């Protein structure tokens, strides 16, 4: 089945992973250096051994493609993946006068009373982002995140580079180039970024009328993050191939530190007891050609029949 490389990775980390402390103080079992390969001609690699919310993957990727860095677009599509990073800026500002939200990530997981207050303040924040344009402009923007790095990389000359737009043009005009690369890792920006990019660099490859993509991911949360990453970059491969008039080839996923958090071990073991089902099929709007013009309704998934979702805490 198409998702077997993911299940093999999870089992390998359970069997061979080294225990490491980490930034979140949760603890992980990790391996360093691993590669998975998915033949996209055989289906779309959205996991079936647990339900993965494809709508969130679509809206996040469209957000990146637009070069958008403000969570307002995500909230308009009921996507809360990036809320905490903007909320952190808001509660640390002199304009915030609500209850103390210091270290809200850890406290909300350990203190039920605080968690209720946190949810209330986050709901108020989200609503204000959606309804107050000036507030959204000030506190909804995350700055140098993927959309900015892909579509408007800031140079030392003071201008910007549309890396992804340039690479798509290169695929059309020089498909066999070995420079079809987009990078999100800028050492100058890393100290001030909302979250230094986990998926740091990707490269396209054209052969025999097929487009393949390889992603290098420096840090990978196997249970919660990697299923999203697989589907997101598979979708990106499909979209770029669609615009360039190519078929899809492989998505190759290369990892640096691939890890399972200690508080995800029971969940991944449950997932590994499930037999994978047939992969779904991706359908793109044939009347749209420029990937930067795609909307949510232009991307559809057919025959997705997953097992139920498995909940797990996010390490913060």
Curated annotation (Swiss-Prot):
It catalyses: dUMP + (6R)-5,10-methylene-5,6,7,8-tetrahydrofolate = 7,8-dihydrofolate + dTMP. Keywords: Cytoplasm, Methyltransferase, Nucleotide biosynthesis, Transferase. Pfam families: Thymidylat_synt (PF00303). DUMP binds at residues 23, 178-179, 218-221, 229, 259-261. GO terms for cellular component: cytosol. Its EC number is 2.1.1.45. One of its GO terms (biological process) is dTMP biosynthetic process. The active site is at 198 (nucleophile). Pathway: Pyrimidine metabolism; dTTP biosynthesis. Transmembrane segments: none annotated. Its main location: cytoplasm. It comes from the Bacteria. The keyword DNA repair does not apply. HAMAP family: Thymidy_synth_bact. This is Thymidylate synthase. It comes from Lacticaseibacillus paracasei (strain ATCC 334 / BCRC 17002 / CCUG 31169 / CIP 107868 / KCTC 3260 / NRRL B-441). The lineage of its organism: Bacteria, Bacillati, Bacillota, Bacilli, Lactobacillales.
